[in-house]
Structures are given as structure tokens and as C-alpha cells.
Amino acid sequence: MGCANSSQVNAQDHAAADKDTTKSNDPIVLQRADPFIYKHTDGYYYFTGSVPTYDAIEIRRAKTIEGLQNAEPFTVWEKHESGPMSRHIWAPEIHYLDGKWYVYFAASEEDDIWALRPYVLELKGQDPLKDEWVELGMMQAADDDPKSFTDFSLDGTVFEHNGKRYFCWAEKTGGQFAASNLYLAEMESPIKLKTVQFMLTTPDYDWERIDFWVNEGAAVIKNEGKIYITFSASATGASYAMGMMEADENADLLDRNSWIKSRYPVLETNEEKDIYGPGHNSFTVDENGDPIMIYHARDYEKAVGDPKMVPATDKRPLEEIKADPLYDPNRHARMMEVKFDNDGRPVFEFY
């Protein structure tokens, strides 16, 4: 398969090296939640994430991760005025599959702001910043799958393993206030699933159930014969935290018995370092080839929603809106070196 240099990371392929990069918890890109970086074979890092207004998809690129901070952002697609893809443009990811560029993102409708579904863009060309992106429509379930993408669905990511390509996404069942679970399926094409959805994880523990029952924002890293899928849990404020699933590299990824889930968060708020609600991460490698995690977090505890970001169809009282961290724009993209314990498991530690 033609995934030239995926955002998934094979950590064992990268020898440790001394880093020239200054280690810091400071943001690399301001006000970009759900950050995603793809390092392509052209030597560029391609960055995207949720813009604060949730109304467009931006991409920037640079030769270094740090260079992304000052790289010019290009708006490559904007929301529709009404109907599908007209509200809540969330968590875009850029991937290179079978010689073509794709963007996966979630979107809802102006008149139904929680009707989120995963959508796909395809590039007609090879320059993601300048060539035309066209809409392929909503991600499609397998022919024998009546459930996938029929309810609140978001945070889709793509990865390859043992010659197969997979799509992992979050979906609620039973309406807006039901649990958000993570699902996994093999892909038939960049826009369609091949297999029926498999529920990878549901919010089992108290730390996954703060304000909302949430598992979302999956990302993949591999090391020493294991595949790991990190995810984020709870509401988008200071309670937001990361968990992790692991499986043997030769296991059937669509078998529940293949996976072990972390009982506790692998990354959470650190008040001493003023890092609140870390999560919705992605993985890449730095210029030395060492694994790096990109994540978002705020630098204060109490998020304050900006009424200007709220859809006109959201009729909640102003005080309730101001208390909603979803509409606080200051989730900043940050980076972290990925370390490994004696058993080869990823360890995530602030500097």
C-alpha cells in the first residue's frame, strides 16, 4: 500500500539521537486544537488542526516542527453556508494514500449542530497548499454494516498495519448525551470501510466520564512488536486526559481479546506546569527520526467560552455558553518527546 510516510510511527525504526531541539512545554502553534502532523517524503511537515471558528480547514508546512509556528497557514477549504458540512468543522487530518492526498474531518449542519459525520477531501494535484481540494462526501460504511456513521461521528484517523489499512473513529450511539466509543474497521478504499465496525473501547473508568462519557481522538504508534492506540477521554476542559490501548503486532486488530486497555490516564492535567486538558494527539518523528507526540492543552484551568464562536442555533443561556470549554479558543498545539519504559511501552512526560 502506498502510504508514503504516515503519521503513525514505528518507533523501533528510529535510533535515538542527541537533539538540538529545545525541550519545552510551550505551544508550537497557538489556538489549534486537535493538532495533526504528517511528515511527507518531500521533507516537509504538514500541519493541520481545528481552527477556533470551526469553519474552515487550514494547512501549513515547514522543514522543521518548530518552523510550523511561523509558517503561513493556507485555507484550503471552507464550510458550506447550509446543509451538510456547514458547521463544526473539527479535527482535520491530512494523509497521503496510494499516491494521493486526502483530508479527513468531521462536520455538522447549521440547523443540526450535533449531527457530526466524517467527511473526506481529495487533492487534484500534488501540492496540498496550492492545488484544488474536492469533496468526496461522507465516509461510507461497509455494505453489510448498518450502524457506522449513523450517529454523532468524528475524529477519524487512518493507519496501516501488516498490509491492511484501518479507519479508527469516535461515535456515539443513542443521541447526543450517550457514550462516545472508539470504533475500528478495515478500509476498502480511502472513502469506504471494508469490514463491519469493531468497538475498540468505551468509557469504562471514572476518569473517562467527567462531564461527558468520551473516548475519542485516536492515534497510532508502534514499538518492539506492539501496536498502541492512544485516545482522549472526558469533556474538553481540564478533565481531558489520554488513555492507551495495546496489542501484539501480529494479533487480529478486530478482535476484542487482542487489546489491553490502560486502567489509568497516560497523560493528564499538570497544575504545577500550567498544562490543562492535554490530549487529542498525533505522532510524527523529529528531524533526527525520533518519535514525537503532538497534542493540545490550555495553560489555565477554567476555560471560558467565547460567545462569538457559538452557532446562532445554540439557544443555551449565555452563562452556560461561557462555561463551555468547547468554545474557548486557547487549546494550543504542543510537542513532546515519546519515551519508552523497560517493556517498550510509550511513556508521556512533560518537560
Predicted features along the sequence, with ranges:
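Carbohydrate-active catalytic/glycan-binding domains of CAZyme proteins
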Residues: 3-351
